[in-house]
Amino acid sequence: MGKHLDSGSKLLDLGTENPFTPQLKAAGYSVSNTQGENLDDDFKKIAQTTCDCVTAFEIFEHLLAPYNILKELKSDKLIASIPLKLWFAEAYWNENDDWDKHYHEFEPKQFQFLLEKTGWKIKDSEFWTSPDQNKIGIRPLLRYFYPRYYIVYCERMQ
């Protein structure tokens, strides 16, 4: 974050307070989280919020239509991370909780296209793995080598 945002920047973090919130505040950022609104239905109200940067850590895969909020955001900067689609694992789906389902697990090119179509230009990005050290098997082994998460820093195209 410090690579792209000054300490003291005002952030709108899409999603309820999470483990990153206190870390961001400790680093000097002013953080406001959404309060559990349905971001598919209430995106216009949220998108009007004034801030230096919108952050979205593993949020867009939970939306039926992430295009809408991405298109409407008034911020000029966006930092977003997503879980990537893995060829050896099914998408996450909690049968008991409609808020805890992945409607999308993107390939990098799909997320990049979504961002481009909603007016964002990726300026920086990183991939990282998510090894599960407590399990034995082919899939846990593959998680050491295949990126599981993708994070981007974007700026609004003029």
Residue ranges of predicted features:
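A short His-aromatic
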Residues: 58-62
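Conserved alpha-helix/loop element of class I SAM-dependent methyltransferases that forms part
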Residues: 1-9
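S-adenosyl-L-methionine-dependent methyltransferase catalytic module, highlighting the catalytic core
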Residues: 3-4, 18-23, 64-158
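A conserved beta-strand element that flanks and buttresses the S-adenosyl-L-methionine
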Residues: 55
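Adenosine-cofactor binding site in Rossmann-like domains, unifying the SAM/SAH pocket
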Residues: 23-48, 84
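Conserved beta-strand positions in the Rossmann-like core of class I SAM-dependent methyltransferases
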Residues: 12, 32, 123
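Conserved class I S-adenosyl-L-methionine
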Residues: 8-17
